[in-house]
Amino acid sequence: MTDMRRLGQRAKQASLLIAPLSTQIKNRFLSTLAKVLVDDTQTLLAANQKDLANAKEHGISDIMMDRLRLTSERIKAIAQGVQQVADLADPIGQVIKGYTNLNGLKILQKRVPLGVIAMIFESRPNVSVDAFSLAFKTNNAIILRGGKDALYSNKALVKLIRQSLEESGITPDAVQLVEDPSHAVAEELMQATDYVDVLIPRGGARLIQTVKEKAKVPVIETGVGNVHIYVDAQADLDMATKIVINAKTKRPSVCNAAEGLVIHEAVAARFIPMLEKAINQVQPVEWRADDKALPLFEQAVPAKAEDFETEFLDYIMSVKVVSSLEEAISWINQHTSHHSEAIITRDIKAAETFQDLVDAAAVYVNASTRFTDGFVFGLGAEIGISTQKMHARGPMGLEALTSTKFYINGDGHIRE
């Protein structure tokens, strides 16, 4: 028997053991875990330093190092996310609807756990805790397979969670970490149909594509953020400048950072110089501009076709000038990864049209795309941001990790 099969068997057994846990027990444990995370900050930072040292040795960029880095403040934020999950209403057992049918059968539809969730993710060690807290609150067992660059951090975090579970009298196999970073083991997890009820990949385009091609278990696609901001003809250009600077430069390595800028031709000649001057005072950006935008920049390079399809995760941004709202919507729908999109405008009708017709999980008016986040949306820590339409869409909180079951009670009913 392979190690992966053993992990799968233990996860399946754990899912049965934690299925009956009450809301009170789950919340008490999560509150304890939030405190333990803060108390053990130095242990976690020491493990993270090993990952950072390895990353530096392998020449990983500063921006990607930021995804990997834990700090005392970030650990506090992770703990706050866990506590927020504890404070949220428990969806398990929630009655969605109840009725008596024509035969006199009493029928209830309730929310129930999915069972065993597998998570394959890259770089960001906070995902280990975020994913576990949501899975545990919804009575699911979880198998975590992080990237090799965060192995020490993930091992320390999962060890801490497992110890806390055991001390609370709960099976530690409610969470397990796949420590083997090989692609072969990852593929085995993708195909573990006997044990895994759903697989959630969270990472770059290559990871998502690999999972789509090789997984045999059900998959919820998340993550890739080719995110656009459209500056409309009726935009407040001061507002647009602040929003673009925030969405591009605040944390360029995250999936809700803006990657593409679409500008109406009526304001392009005023807005581009204004934006370029302002952003250079904060953080210079490499502009990859189309033929109409290029001469309006002091410094830019001609965009290639692939630039409009790329999630840069860096201080780089593609720029497209359009002649109408309709062209902007068409362009964005052609290139979007269906994550988050935004329009800056004072035209209410244009805003409504944009929100109705742009095909993305989150569509903003006059706000930065950086808000697409489970914590910000009040969902607690998120397990990912779904870019598909089936089962879940957008930041995935507790309800996204549940299924439904029909409970039918009769009194000797038979069907004639």
Curated annotation (Swiss-Prot):
Main localization, broad class:
cytoplasm
EC number of the protein: 1.2.1.41
Gene3D superfamilies, alphabetized:
Aldehyde Dehydrogenase, Chain A, domain 1, Aldehyde Dehydrogenase, Chain A, domain 2
TM segment ranges: none
Q: Name one GO molecular function term.
A: glutamate-5-semialdehyde dehydrogenase activity
**What's the catalysed reaction?**
L-glutamate 5-semialdehyde + phosphate + NADP(+) = L-glutamyl 5-phosphate + NADPH + H(+)
What's this protein's family per the entry? Belongs to the gamma-glutamyl phosphate reductase family.
Write down what this protein is called: Gamma-glutamyl phosphate reductase
Which organism is this protein's natural source? Streptococcus pyogenes serotype M4 (strain MGAS10750)
Q: What is the lineage of its organism?
A: Bacteria, Bacillati, Bacillota, Bacilli, Lactobacillales
Tell me the name of the encoding gene. Answer: proA
